């Protein structure tokens, strides 16, 4: 089974990824955890470029796609073949939202490129943790921000709206109210996850 977590920066996604991983550890369920961009030697090098270097929107998208293609071929496909659960802190839907909508490259264009980069390998469940943009920005205000996290409210609103549209169009999306407590969110995720097992 392949599970990804999505949401705008500051939604609490990475916290929930780690809590689900802890749950799998406790239950003795074999898994691997990956992140995007990253998860491979090449992917981590690309991550560093994406976070620190100024670049045009198309270059940004193509770097994310290169990282994703390597991650799918060298980590995700082998793990799924070996019966492990893959837990991804972001995956292809992030590019649709961030580059397709936020950078205005077009969600349909990004979807086509994602199909190529992932060899049409997609999550069985997408936990989309939804929070209003002002809540996410408040959570991020005291953090060191990378190049993308420094974007303004309009950018984040565009991304959130794109995620909500994808959630309506994809039955494997599970919308999680990210304004609740960490524990409440985790309980809901575990309940949904166990129903899929």
From Swiss-Prot:
- Alphabetized GO MF terms: ATP binding; dTMP kinase activity
Looking at the keywords, is Glycosyltransferase present?
A: no
Q: Which InterPro entries match?
A: P-loop_NTPase (IPR027417), Thymidylate_kin-like_dom (IPR039430), Thymidylate_kinase (IPR018094)
Keyword Nucleus appears in the UniProt entry: no
Name a biological process GO annotation.
dTDP biosynthetic process
EC number(s) recorded for this UniProt protein: 2.7.4.9
Instruction: Fetch the Pfam families from UniProt.
Output: Thymidylate_kin
Superkingdom is Bacteria
Kindly state which reaction or reactions the protein catalyses. dTMP + ATP = dTDP + ADP
Keywords, sorted A to Z: ATP-binding, Kinase, Nucleotide biosynthesis, Nucleotide-binding, Transferase
Query: Can you tell me which family this protein belongs to?
Result: Belongs to the thymidylate kinase family.
Q: Which PANTHER family match?
A: THYMIDYLATE KINASE, UMP-CMP KINASE 2, MITOCHONDRIAL
| Record function comment | Phosphorylation of dTMP to form dTDP in both de novo and salvage pathways of dTTP synthesis.
Instruction: Kindly provide the name given to this protein in its UniProt entry.
Output: Thymidylate kinase
Origin species, per record, is Fervidobacterium nodosum (strain ATCC 35602 / DSM 5306 / Rt17-B1)
Q: Gene encoding it?
A: tmk
